[in-house]
Amino acid sequence: MTVVNKSFLTILIFFCQILFPLNASALEAPRTVKAWASVLGDNIAETWNEPQHVDLYVPAITWHARFAYDKEKTDRYNERPWGAGMGKSRWDEKGNWHGLYVMAFKDSYNKWEPIAGYGWEATWRPLTDDAFHVGLGYTVGVTARDNWDYIPIPLVLPLASVGYGPATFQMTYIPGTYNNGNVYFAWLRLQF
């Protein structure tokens, strides 16, 4: 097993443990998944029906992990994903962020890639200035790529962010194998 595959497997196991915590009884697992799906559905509906903000998304950077690619490939790839998006978002009673979004940007091959989904982040305000915030969470959505004939591709990815007031720099990491995936993708999210 290569280092890249071990890293991917470690990340996958970590996020599966967060998303689907193990219970003492195997019989409780289906109820846990059902409860998680119900909460997810409720959060999506509440964000859609009762948003607090309208968001502008501006893609900022894609970076292909150099340890996971041949140099010839990374030399050809686009890492400036210009595009734009919009969304609706809210902060819940715990101070966590929920958002629905749609975005289109130029992918690694400089072709348009749309993405739409729901994102959630646990949010912390570690400084005395409450305008500064950091977050960790996930996004569930669907994308489509030119090199896959624009077939819809479901996704579950980690999210992280750092922000001040209405401006947030949000990011994800797309895991993969050698010469595929292993991409850091980040964007600016402005709340109005």
Curated annotation (Swiss-Prot):
Q: What's the protein called, per UniProt?
A: Lipid A acyltransferase PagP
Where does the secretion signal sit in this chain? 1-26
Q: Name one GO cellular component term.
A: cell outer membrane
Q: Does the keyword Acyltransferase apply?
A: yes
> EC number(s) in its UniProt entry?
2.3.1.251
Family matches, as InterPro entries = LipidA_acyl_PagP, OMP/PagP_b-brl
State the organism's lineage: Bacteria, Pseudomonadati, Pseudomonadota, Gammaproteobacteria, Enterobacterales
Q: Give the annotated active site.
A: 64, 107-108
Which top EC class applies here?
transferase
Q: How does it assemble?
A: Homodimer.
